[in-house]
């Protein structure tokens, strides 16, 4: 029995050790530093610790997998990936990422070189694009620079594809895959070479937009890429900005998510908040319908699907909601019965035969 207790104690200590986040920043004075984390596109404080002799240790067991970072005095910070493993990173300023050394962490042995590679290629592409911007399309060098830019973009695509293919199951691979664009095939044509559907590219892209996102990996919501994709999906470039269209695809998207996941929490919350604050007339319909479906209803246990909302907040969110839903676009409003201007006859709203009513002063 004593032997078993020693074994279990050893395994427990090993598990705790395996989730430590050890970071070293050369020439950094002793100070208070912060571990920061993403939820969607926003950064939040995750933990606080004292850095001594340029070194700091955080307890990773307190954190959820995703992209996190070390926040230093002077608004300086650098990011890395946490996925329930021990991390040992060392770096120095002023360019923390360029000087980053991964001493321990399988995820960051993929992530840090990837970030460095992408940063390098972006710099090269930016320089070529700047040169090309000074030329006219008919200039010979214009086409040459375009070819060089295409070649660099191809290098990035190959790097990303290899990283994803060679590292199945790694969180970094899923993050990279999520960031890659869907490849749209050539549209079908008839025997004479005419397009069968002029909207084929858009329809295909829209239908396959989320193909590169693993919705079963909840950690993907803990970085800004998912948030940016969600915002673009519901934006004017992808979707008609009509309240009924937004509601249709919002319901379809959110209903397909795990209702206990943080991805569900973020998506439902973001959609409701975004259209609740919209200054576009009619978009309040999206907000009220989201409240009705995901906040102000009860499951079999009597709980709201919005598990992240404090109980004392539901009264404000749901108060008089049914009446509010009767005032939105496309819904027949409650009948009003009022005296006419002579104050002798009662007129009800539903009996008006005009297509529009006009109030003249």
What are the language-model segments listed below?
Residues 282-328:
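Non-catalytic accessory segments flanking enzyme active sites
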Residues 19-168, 175-210, 216:
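A non-transmembrane, solvent-exposed segment enriched in polar/low-complexity residues
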Residues 243-302:
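A cross-family structural signal marking well-folded subdomains
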Residues 1-24:
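Bacterial Sec-dependent N-terminal signal peptides
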Residues 170-178, 227-228, 264-270:
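Amphipathic alpha-helical repeat scaffolds of TPR domains
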Residues 361:
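Conserved small/polar residues in nucleotide/adenosyl-binding loops
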Residues 308-356:
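N-terminal "domain-start" segment that seeds a small globular fold
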Residues 194-243:
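A recognition module on extended beta-rich or small alphabeta surfaces enriched in W/G with H and D/E
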């Amino acid at each position: 029995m004593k032997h078993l207790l020693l074994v279990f104690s050893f395994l427990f200590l090993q598990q705790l050790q395996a989730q430590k986040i050890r970071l070293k920043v050369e020439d950094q004075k002793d100070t208070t530093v912060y571990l920061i984390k993403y939820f969607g596109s926003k950064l939040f404080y995750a933990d606080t610790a004292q850095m001594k002799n340029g070194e700091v240790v955080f307890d990773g067991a307190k954190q959820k997998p995703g992209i996190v970072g070390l926040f230093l005095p002077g608004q300086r910070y650098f990011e890395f990936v946490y996925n329930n493993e021990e991390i040992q990173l060392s770096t120095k300023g002023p360019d923390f990422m360029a000087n980053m050394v991964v001493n321990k962490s399988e995820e960051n042995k993929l992530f840090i070189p990837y970030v460095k590679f992408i940063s390098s290629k972006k710099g090269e592409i930016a320089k070529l694009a700047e040169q090309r911007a000074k030329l006219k399309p008919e200039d010979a060098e214009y086409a040459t620079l375009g070819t060089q830019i295409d070649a660099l973009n191809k290098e990035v695509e190959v790097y990303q594809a290899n990283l994803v293919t060679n590292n199945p199951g790694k969180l970094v691979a899923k993050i990279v895959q999520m960031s890659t664009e869907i490849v749209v095939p050539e549209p079908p044509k008839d025997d004479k070479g005419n397009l069968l559907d002029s909207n084929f590219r858009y329809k295909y892209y829209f239908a396959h937009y989320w193909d590169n996102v693993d919705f079963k990996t909840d950690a993907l919501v803990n970085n800004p890429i998912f948030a940016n994709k969600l915002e673009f999906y519901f934006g004017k470039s992808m979707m008609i900005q009509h309240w009924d269209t937004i509601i249709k695809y919002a319901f379809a998207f959110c209903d397909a998510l795990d209702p206990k996941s943080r991805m569900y929490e973020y998506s439902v919350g973001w959609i409701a908040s975004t259209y609740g604050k919209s200054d576009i007339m009619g978009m309040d319909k999206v907000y009220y319908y989201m409240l009705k479906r995901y906040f102000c209803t009860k499951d079999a246990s009597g709980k709201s699907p919005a598990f992240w909302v404090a109980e004392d907040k539901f009264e404000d969110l749901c108060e008089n909601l049914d009446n509010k839903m009767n005032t939105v676009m496309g819904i027949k409003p409650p009948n009003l019965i009022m005296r006419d201007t002579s104050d002798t006859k009662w007129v009800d709203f539903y009996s008006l035969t005009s297509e529009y009513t006009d109030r003249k002063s």
